[in-house]
Amino acid sequence: IGASIIASDASFAFGAGLVTIVLQNEKNIPCHIMQSKSVSDNCTAIALGMGLGEIESLKLEEILQLNIPKVLDADIFYNPLIVKYLDENVVLTPHPKEFISLLKLTNIANISIEELQENRFLYVEKFCKIYPKVTLLLKGANVIISQNKNMYINTFGSQKLSKGGSGDILTGLISSLLAQG
């Protein structure tokens, strides 16, 4: 739940307005974040995956089927259900280990971290060629952002961003932008 709170706080701070965490059981969360057992009908964007752990496949599929912008992160990259939703406009924010899992789930490659790190651009290009609607943001020392045939590299990374929670903040910021249109 901590990762979800971090992402929600970031989304709220970045201007998303009403932010809700979907939980099966009520938890003690900050008062500016709502909680619900289901996704609201007026939801304009979803961030999914942080602290996901073991969620019922039916519930996960129900959320993934919603026709609203999504940013997917963390545990979602280990769930085979994700493959069904890669043909739509979605933002993915994996770190290298999560991207390796995604490559394996999509049958693109079964590689090691070392192989990925040596050929990051190649595997990003392969993935985005097969899934051109996906916006992929591969985290690392130099973040690679790619969609279809376009690829951008952010060379302004910092060791300070390799701390736990920084990816959750990034997911919250992206979901806030998606929610605001």
Language model regions located:
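Small-residue (G/A/S/T)-rich helix-start motifs and N-terminal tracts that mark the onset
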Residues: I1-V71, I76-V91, P96, I100-G181
